[in-house]
Curated annotation (Swiss-Prot):
Cofactor binding comment, as recorded: Binds 1 Mg(2+) ion per subunit.
Binding residues annotated for Mg(2+), in chain numbering: 493, 495, 497
HAMAP family: RNApol_bact_RpoC1
EC number of the protein: 2.7.7.6
Protein family membership: Belongs to the RNA polymerase beta' chain family. RpoC1 subfamily.
Protein's recorded name: DNA-directed RNA polymerase subunit beta'
Keywords (A to Z) from UniProt: Chloroplast, DNA-directed RNA polymerase, Magnesium, Metal-binding, Nucleotidyltransferase, Plastid, Transcription, Transferase, Zinc
Cofactor: Mg(2+); Zn(2+)
Species the sequence originates in: Angiopteris evecta
A Pfam match: RNA_pol_Rpb1_1
GO biological-process terms attached to the record: DNA-templated transcription
Catalytic activity: RNA(n) + a ribonucleoside 5'-triphosphate = RNA(n+1) + diphosphate
Binding residues for Zn(2+): 69, 71, 87, 90
Length: 687
């Protein structure tokens, strides 16, 4: 277990062969060193015990049962004291079985194997540091064109049998046939080690011979020369120069990183392969006799099996054809590639059911990988998740929480309230009351929620407004309701987005939520300072629909000439008249008018609104016998007396606009009252 006080950070880097051995090797009290896995077997088919030196060997990874060795002998294990005693017959330590979760093993490869991440992943680090085409290195690693393609690099201070140097390509293969007949297998291995190299061995030789300082200096000088070259008129040539400069920058960064971290480039070629602990790649036998196993076990078995075959070819067979050895090395390379990143070279390695094996890369990468699923992000208690819908009736700092979700999130608080009020005798009774959904539990839940904020989070949390605090309100249904103005901070909309709910438990967390994280205190963008709680498209469309009027307006009666009355302003008699807001809202409730139908409202607040429209010509002017005139305009009408003084003013509006205006007035009035109250408090404090 990693303790945060001792290990403040975690860094992933290349491991040397010695480091991999140190992870796995252990020295027993009798002096024997264990840790190397040499057999591809797992469990014995009769005894169901792990095979010795296999992938589940108890001697290497620890006992399956705590304090019991492979022979069945037992010894008590004291957790406060480490026991180095072990069984002299089977060599298994008397220790806790939990060591099988972190004890590793290793496989000593019969030939160097190139790490596929550093060869095939883009950018290819091996190709960059060697300054060679990736296709050329692939042909060399996998022996696709051997013996036509190999690396000729004689060993220093030794006589040369062939005067070759560099990457050689021969169409005439007669010489290689003569050499393979002249040398035995061991003799050819000695010759090959001195004169030619293929596969991962060739890559390792080139990486080991690199002088990183010289690589950095030469790349820097070339980049400096290219930077001084002025732009040509040839676009193709300019692009070629730019690509070369980008390559040199990557090469300088890579060599500089190797120098600063004391990592050797040849570590990108594997000589020792680590084996995961058995508990991380389990094998389970079902009651019917079937076995469920991790894909890692099958991939490790293929590597060990092919590695042992190559060892036999090199050690036991005196006249094995050299081409067979090259082919076996290629099989080992492909098996290790499948373990690390299956399918990276095209066709993945498959099992008997034609299903691709799940490699190490698939286990750790992606949203459901080990890092993002288990290490960087974990499921936590007192949290929930649901779809968000709009809640226009909510205040800015409120959110609607479904009853089903709220009773689960605040269950412990409700249980404490039930027991504290003597409505339940113990924990079991309280849970039964909650399970039966008694009516009075909702009242207790509301009291609990009233003083307890919740945190809403929408992934991805790209800035601090991605998680904000709200006052929960109980609602029906199963969706979380959210005020539309806070969607800007979350970058959310109501087309199926989901949000997570978290309950802050400690007093410090609740205080921080109330003081710093409440939505009504986060109205400005932390990046730009611009308002972020602004109406979104949904709100703008809603306001547009609320305040729209029918397309005909005051001219609607022109299409109904038979409905005119004897009113003095008969041309516009179909449009109703109202003296105040209350009459309009009452008519709306009685469905005598709808939201969009035009109506005349007597305006008594400010008659100066017509000053800007004095130049507008009236549509119609009507006179009464008493001398009173009616001047009808497109959006208002004026009633004047004999002395041309304004007796009354009516404006053309709709019920929707009246509702909108009333809400705006109430909001402004409440803001002014709150501001005045706050100023009075500050004044009282200063006095």
């Amino acid at each position: 277990m990693i303790h945060h006080n001792n290990y403040p950070q975690l860094r992933i880097e290349l491991a040397s062969p010695e480091q991999i051995r140190a992870w796995a090797e252990r020295r027993l009290p009798n002096g024997e060193v264990v840790g190397q896995v040499t057999q591809a077997s797992t469990f014995h088919y009769k005894t169901h015990k792990p095979e010795r030196d296999g992938l589940f060997c108890e001697k290497i990874f620890g006992p399956i049962r705590s304090g019991i060795c492979s022979c069945g002998n037992s010894k008590s294990v004291d957790e406060k004291k480490e026991y180095s005693n072990f069984c002299k017959q089977c060599g298994v330590e008397f220790t806790d079985s939990r060591v099988r979760r972190y004890r590793m093993g290793y496989i000593k490869l019969a030939c160097p194997v190139t790490h596929v991440w550093y060869l095939k992943r883009l950018p290819s680090y091996i190709a960059n540091i060697l300054a060679k085409p990736l296709k050329e290195l692939e042909n060399l690693v996998y022996g696709d064109t051997y013996p036509n393609l190999f690396l000729a690099r004689p060993v220093a201070k030794k006589p040369n049998l062939l005067r070759l140097r560099g990457l050689c390509n021969y169409d005439n293969q007669s010489w290689i046939k003569i050499l393979s007949r002249f040398f035995s297998t061991r003799g050819f291995e000695i010759f090959q080690g001195r004169e030619i190299a293929t596969g991962g061995h060739a890559i390792k030789k080139q990486l080991a011979s690199l002088d990183l300082k010289s690589v950095f200096n030469s790349a820097y000088l070339e980049w400096k020369e290219l930077s001084e070259v002025e732009s040509t008129e040839d676009e193709w040539e300019d692009q070629t120069i730019q690509r070369r400069k980008d390559f040199l920058i990557r090469r300088m960064k890579l060599s500089k990183h190797f120098l600063h971290t004391n990592i050797k480039p040849e570590w990108m070629v594997l000589d020792v392969l680590p084996v995961l602990p058995p508990e991380l790649r389990p094998m389970i036998e079902l009651s019917e006799g079937d076995v469920i196993t991790s894909d890692f076990n099958e991939l490790y078995r293929k590597i060990i099996y092919r590695n042992n075959i190559l060892l036999d070819l090199l050690l036991k067979s005196a006249f094995t054809p050299e081409g067979l050895i090259i082919c076996q090395k290629k099989l080992i390379q492909e098996a290790v590639d499948a373990l690390i990143d299956n399918g990276i070279r095209g066709q993945p390695l498959r099992d008997s059911n034609n299903r691709p094996y799940k490699s190490f890369s698939e286990v750790i990468e992606g949203k459901e990988g080990r890092f993002r699923e288990n290490l960087l992000g974990k499921r936590v208690d007192y949290s929930g998740r649901s779809v968000i819908v709009v809640g226009p009736s909510l205040q800015l700092h409120q959110c609607g929480l479904p009853r089903e979700m709220a009773i689960e999130l605040f269950q412990s608080f409700v249980i404490r309230g039930l027991i504290g009020r003597h409505l339940a005798r113990n924990l079991r009774d309280a849970k039964n009351i909650i399970r039966n959904k008694e009516i009075f539990i909702w009242k207790i839940l509301q009291e609990v929620m009233q003083g307890h904020p919740v945190l809403l989070n929408r992934a991805p949390t790209l800035h601090r407004l991605g998680i904000q605090a709200f006052q929960p309100v109980l609602i029906e249904g199963r969706a979380i309701r959210l005020h539309p103005l806070v969607c800007g901070g979350f970058n959310a909309d109501f087309d199926g987005d989901q949000m997570a709910v978290h309950v802050p438990l400690s007093i410090e967390a609740q205080t921080e939520a109330r003081v710093l994280m409440f939505s009504h205190t986060n109205l400005l963008s932390p990046a730009t300072g611009d308002p972020i709680a602004v109406p979104s498209q949904d709100m703008l469309l809603g306001l547009y629909v609320l305040t729209i009027e029918n397309s005909q307006g005051i001219y609607g009666n022109r299409y109904y000439p038979n409905e005119r009355t004897k009113d003095p302003i008969s041309s516009f008699s179909r449009i109703p008249y109202f003296s105040n807001y209350d009459d309009i809202l009452r008519a709306k409730e009685q469905e005598r008018v709808d939201l969009h139908s035009p109506l005349w409202l007597r305006w008594q607040k400010d008659l100066r609104i017509i000053t800007s429209l004095t130049r507008e010509l009236p549509i119609e002017i009507q006179y009464e016998s008493s001398g009173i005139s009616f001047q009808i305009y497109e959006n208002y009408q004026i009633r004047k007396g004999q002395s041309e003084d304004i007796l009354s003013l009516y404006i053309l509006t709709t019920a929707g606009r009246i509702l909108f205006n009333q809400q705006i007035e109430e909001a402004i009035q409440s803001t002014l009252e709150a501001s005045q109250h706050r100023n009075q408090q500050l004044l009282a404090i200063t006095i």
